[in-house]
């Protein structure tokens, strides 16, 4: 862990920066709270009585060891400590777009550069910021965050906000957040998140193969089926709206078409839920819209995943060589980075959305 004297900088680093003292203060105090209350997982296991959480924490340690041993992810104290929090999410990120565009607003700060979201430790603060942006006419989305990375500045603890997730989802989160610690490109949310998702997906595939557990395999296959349906729905809706927004139609007609597209999206989702037997994990996402901001938020995480997957394949699946290539790309200016990634991945196209 870095000295607490550096905490102000790290808070700016992990949150989507802001010039106000209030914003930085909530980031500093929120991060301190997580760190000072964290306990080593072995010590928690000695006294915990909840058998479900105990088994989950044992699994966390095994996944954490696998991440460094087999995936080449950072070997440090992250996810070897545990913090109990009294809320469903640790952070809430605010996303905003214009009403007829998917161009996500950016917030900038000195250390991490510019990112397409702004994070708060208190939901009420995130909702207040979203209301302020909505009053200006923006589409807004507030996304709950179960875990995040301080990019190696601190030893990120395992949080109660996701300890009860399915084992496959816990593995995803740990692999994803450790991938951020390994490398980070300033001012490029899509690059950073797409890279981390590609590591998460490859890591999960390898971890599952090592477990020889049919229940885990079924858990993964079911989750992937739901995720693929959701992503396809987002992709179809976004493609339809991008075509509409780029047309010569009047803004009034575009707004009407937008409303129709999102209503059709809701109907498709309800039909999908019936086919899933009532699985409702995406209800939170739909409850706030959907709108341009919520679609943009999804796309930020997966837009360039196919390019990173192609780059890994070009390296023969060798993760250390893949990481070296990605680090080299991260060091380039953003425009050059995008061209180099496209070339390095054999011209593989990026996803319009998830």
Residue ranges and their predicted role:
Residues 1-4:
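Positively charged n-region of N-terminal signal peptides that target proteins for export
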Residues 6-16:
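Bacterial N-terminal signal peptides
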Residues 17-39:
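Bacterial Sec signal peptide processing site at the extreme N-terminus
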Residues 31-67:
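Amphipathic alpha-helical packing elements
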Residues 34, 53-60, 119-126, 163-172, ...:
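Solvent-exposed, acidic/flexible segments
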Residues 35-49, 107-115, 288-290, 306:
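Acidic/histidine-rich, surface-exposed loop or edge segments in extracytoplasmic proteins
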Residues 62-227:
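Acidic/His-rich structured neighborhood in mature extracellular/periplasmic domains
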Residues 232-354:
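Pan-zinc metallopeptidase signature
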């Amino acid at each position: 862990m870095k000295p607490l004297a550096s905490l102000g900088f790290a808070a700016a680093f992990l949150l989507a920066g802001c010039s106000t003292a209030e914003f930085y203060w909530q980031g500093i105090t929120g991060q301190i709270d997580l760190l000072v209350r964290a306990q080593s997982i072995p010590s928690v296991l000695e006294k915990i009585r909840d058998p479900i959480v105990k088994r989950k924490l044992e699994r966390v340690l095994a996944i954490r060891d696998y991440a460094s041993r087999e995936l080449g992810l950072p070997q440090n104290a992250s996810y070897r400590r545990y913090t109990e929090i009294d809320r469903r999410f640790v952070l809430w990120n605010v996303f905003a777009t214009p009403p007829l565009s998917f161009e996500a607003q950016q917030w900038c700060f000195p250390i991490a550069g510019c990112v397409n979201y702004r994070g708060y430790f208190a939901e009420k603060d995130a909702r207040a910021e979203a209301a302020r942006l909505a009053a200006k006419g923006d589409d807004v989305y507030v996304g709950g965050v179960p875990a995040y990375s301080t990019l190696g500045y601190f030893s990120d603890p395992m949080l109660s906000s996701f300890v009860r997730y399915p084992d496959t989802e816990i593995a995803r989160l740990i692999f994803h957040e450790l991938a951020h610690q390994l490398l980070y490109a300033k001012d490029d949310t899509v690059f950073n998140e797409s890279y981390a998702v590609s590591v998460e997906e490859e890591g999960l595939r390898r971890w599952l193969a090592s477990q020889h557990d049919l229940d885990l395999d079924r858990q993964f296959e079911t989750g992937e089926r739901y995720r693929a349906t959701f992503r396809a729905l987002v992709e179809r809706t976004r493609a339809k709206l991008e075509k509409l927004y780029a047309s010569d139609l009047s803004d009034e007609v575009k707004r009407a078409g937008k409303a129709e597209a999102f209503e059709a999206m809701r109907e498709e989702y309800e039909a999908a839920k019936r086919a899933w037997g009532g699985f409702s994990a995406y209800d939170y996402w739909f409850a706030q819209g959907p709108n341009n901001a919520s679609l943009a938020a999804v796309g930020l995480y997966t837009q360039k995943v196919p390019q990173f997957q192609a780059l890994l394949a070009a390296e023969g699946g060798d993760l250390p060589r893949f990481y070296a290539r990605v680090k080299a790309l991260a060091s380039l200016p953003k425009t050059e980075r995008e061209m180099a990634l496209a070339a390095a991945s054999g011209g593989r196209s990026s996803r319009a959305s998830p």
